[in-house]
Amino acid sequence: MEAIAKYDFKATADDELSFKRGDILKVLNEECDQNWYKAELNGKDGFIPKNYIEMKPHPWFFGKIPRAKAEEMLSKQRHDGAFLIRESESAPGDFSLSVKFGNDVQHFKVLRDGAGKYFLWVVKFNSLNELVDYHRSTSVSRNQQIFLRDIEQVPQQPTYVQALFDFDPQEDGELGFRRGDFIHVMDNSDPNWWKGACHGQTGMFPRNYVTPVNRNV
């Protein structure tokens, strides 16, 4: 996940990370502390105050969604190349790319070099966003021609929904909320589980726990 710095921050401890307003940081872990994230900038990593940054979620980033749930979602897509990026279940801090091709869903480990650059094969990138954009026109596979395409959205997707009930996450990658909360819908291509953002967090939530609202909040 990427974030943009809203203010300058000067580290005051060895495990903190300094940055300037406007810097794009790679957030490595959002669960270290209630007020601090672990992030990386220019090959260095450390802790940063969460209120100094603004998260920049991409519609293709699904966080800690389990591999099985990724396969379930992508198998319902109609076109090859439909994809998502998720946090690796087996290697915390790493990422996996899941892509639909034919009747299968293929998974690629997103590798990183010593400088923190991302890659699948040879070409390296400063961010996941750059990697995704490159593989929209260059195959992610060496065995088939698979080009990344955004997950198909259902037409007239509601921008916001409101929670009808409290929901406490049962698995990694799910989004918790309280009754009455407004949730920004990021993907509703699955009939049962939608992706959304609430209180600065993103994740999956059950469709039958919410109701559409006809205004922005």
Curated annotation (Swiss-Prot):
Residues 1-58, 156-215 form the SH3 domain. One of its GO terms (cellular component) is plasma membrane. It is found in: Nucleus; Cytoplasm; Endosome; Golgi apparatus. Keywords: Acetylation, Cytoplasm, Endosome, Golgi apparatus, Host-virus interaction, Isopeptide bond, Nucleus, Phosphoprotein, Repeat, SH2 domain, SH3 domain, Ubl conjugation. The modification N6-acetyllysine is found at residues 6, 50, 109. Non-enzymatic adapter protein that plays a pivotal role in precisely regulated signaling cascades from cell surface receptors to cellular responses, including signaling transduction and gene expression. Thus, participates in many biological processes including regulation of innate and adaptive immunity, autophagy, DNA repair or necroptosis. Controls signaling complexes at the T-cell antigen receptor to facilitate the activation, differentiation, and function of T-cells. This is Growth factor receptor-bound protein 2. InterPro entries: Grb2-like, GRB2_C_SH3, GRB2_N_SH3, SH2, SH2_dom_sf, SH3-like_dom_sf, SH3_domain. There is a cross-link at residue 109 (Glycyl lysine isopeptide (Lys-Gly) (interchain with G-Cter in ubiquitin)). CDD domains: SH2_Grb2_like (cd09941), SH3_GRB2_C (cd11949), SH3_GRB2_N (cd11946). GO terms for molecular function: ephrin receptor binding; epidermal growth factor receptor binding; guanyl-nucleotide exchange factor adaptor activity; identical protein binding; insulin receptor substrate binding; neurotrophin TRKA receptor binding; phosphotyrosine residue binding; protein kinase binding. The modification Phosphotyrosine is found at residue 209. Changing residue 109 to R: Loss of polyubiquitination. The modification N-acetylmethionine is found at residue 1. It comes from the Eukaryota. The SH3 domains mediate interaction with RALGPS1 and SHB. GO terms for biological process: actin cytoskeleton organization; B cell receptor signaling pathway; branching involved in labyrinthine layer morphogenesis; cellular response to ionizing radiation; endodermal cell differentiation; epidermal growth factor receptor signaling pathway; fibroblast growth factor receptor signaling pathway; insulin receptor signaling pathway. Gene3D superfamilies: SH2 domain, SH3 Domains. Homodimer. Associates (via SH2 domain) with activated EGF and PDGF receptors (tyrosine phosphorylated). Interacts with PDGFRA (tyrosine phosphorylated); the interaction may be indirect. Also associates to other cellular Tyr-phosphorylated proteins such as SIT1, IRS1, IRS2, IRS4, SHC and LNK; probably via the concerted action of both its SH2 and SH3 domains. It also seems to interact with RAS in the signaling pathway leading to DNA synthesis. Interacts with SOS1. Forms a complex with MUC1 and SOS1, through interaction of the SH3 domains with SOS1 and the SH2 domain with phosphorylated MUC1. (Microbial infection) Interacts (via SH3 domain) with hepatitis E virus/HEV ORF3 protein. Phosphorylation of Tyr-209 in the C-terminal SH3 domain reduces its binding to SOS1. Belongs to the GRB2/sem-5/DRK family. SUPFAM superfamilies: SH2 domain, SH3-domain. The modification Phosphothreonine is found at residue 211.
